[in-house]
Amino acid sequence: MNSKLSLSTKLSQSGKTQLAEYFATPPFKVITLPSYDDAWVNGLNAMQMSSSPGVLAGDVLEIDISLAKLTALSLNTQAFTRVQAMNEGESAMQTTHISRAENSRLFYLPHPLVLHKDSIFKQQTQIEMREQSELIYGEIVAIGRVLNDERFAFRQFSSHLKIYALQNDGKKRPLVSDCIQWLPSKMNLTALSQMENYSHQGSLTYLNLAKSNAEIKQQVQALQQQFTDEKALLIGISLLNECGLMVRVLGHRAETIQQLFEKIGKQLKVL
């Protein structure tokens, strides 16, 4: 099935973020939620939903999100995305494109992906940011239905994340390029520096084009100190080359990583 979700934001006369345009084909749907206590006081809180039991063979999913100047969007999803079993030669893919105007802010944390036996899933995410914009973006993936004894039983998983700063001359300046490529039949994914004995991996990327590298470095040091004694998760926090940081996590439960990213995201919103 070919499915598309497209949404954009606008600023109301009272300075609140609203949906400007919204289009979705099954199984996608988005609902806006009541305002809540958040550092982005004029932001919009929304939930991305799906009526499908998961990602099926042959699915081509397209997500397009555009934020207008001075708007802020916090977008979560309803539930885990399960990539269902597929026959040999079948696959599914998702492309996500996010464009950000000046002084816009986005928090986007989809629920974890669960890779079922024999599945192949490929996703590509491209994000474009303009001056003074802010991004908190997370991805979490499970290596299979671990409680069913499925560990690395999928055929392939790839995830490519590219983030650019759009300059006034129209050129793109690369900020982040991150790639995950898992082929269990050809790779020892339990080796040292790979997944080892962990079953879930998460990455959280934070970029703020209004902050200096010195300010971001202080945030990195504060987060590193905060999670020094964490036992349930293996956490690495790194300073990006420009205007941002990345948190990489290995764990045994998706909910633990999800809650960690929500906690960090809430902190980053107020810094």
Features from the language model and the residues they span:
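Solvent-exposed loop and beta-edge segments used for protein-protein assembly and interaction
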Residues: 1, 57, 90, 117-119, ...
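N-terminal, charged/glycine-rich beta-strand/loop interface patches
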Residues: 1-102, 106-112, 117
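Broad gene-expression machinery/nucleic-acid interaction feature
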Residues: 2-6, 43, 60-62, 93-95, ...
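A short, polar/proline- and glycine-enriched secondary-structure boundary/capping micro-motif
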Residues: 28-32, 84-89, 118-120, 146-150, ...
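Short, structured patches in soluble enzyme cores that scaffold and shape functional sites
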Residues: 67-69, 77-79, 100-102, 110-112, ...
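Structural motif
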Residues: 72-74, 105-106, 134-135, 202-203, ...
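Internal, conserved structured core segments that host functional sites
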Residues: 89-153
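A structural signal for small-residue-enriched, beta-sheet-centric alpha/beta enzyme cores
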Residues: 141, 146-266, 271
